Design a protein with these regions (language model features):
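Short polar catalytic/cofactor-binding loops
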Residues: 10-13, 100
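Histidine (H) residue identity feature
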Residues: 7, 20-23, 96
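Glycine-rich beta-strand-turn "strand-cap" elements at beta-sheet edges
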Residues: 39-52, 78-101
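Short amphipathic alpha-helical segments
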Residues: 14-40, 74-82
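Short, well-ordered beta-strand segments in beta-rich or mixed alpha/beta enzyme
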Residues: 2-9, 40-74
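Weak global preference for isoleucine
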Residues: 2-5, 26, 30, 35, ...
Length: 101
């Protein structure tokens, strides 16, 4: 199993709108793609002194399933324009880990 982890940061003013966009539109769109080997997605949120950090954790059966989601350069972050508009900054690349236990 492969876990894909990505970080994005918003201002406090944009945090609720960003979370809503993810929950109501972006995550729904990912699920609707019915990618074989996609197992799920989680969203973490943490308030910081200068904004809000979000972490997405996606689970896949294999790197091939990750490629089906993200493309050949599977480490490249997938950040739709609506999300970019609400983010102050974000990781340009996602990290991938093999689950061993």
């Amino acid at each position: 199993m492969i876990v894909r982890i990505w970080h994005g940061w918003t201002t406090r003013a944009n945090a609720d709108a960003y979370e809503h966009l993810l929950h109501e539109e972006i995550f729904v769109g990912i699920r609707n793609r019915e990618i074989e080997g996609f197992r799920g997605i989680q969203l973490l949120r943490r308030r910081l002194a200068d904004g809000v950090e979000f972490v997405t954790i996606m689970t896949f059966d294999s790197l091939e399933a990750v490629r089906d989601f993200a493309g050949a350069d599977y480490e490249q972050a997938v950040v739709p324009p609506k999300a970019r508009a609400l983010l102050a900054r974000f990781d340009e690349r996602s990290a991938h880990y093999e689950v061993v236990i």
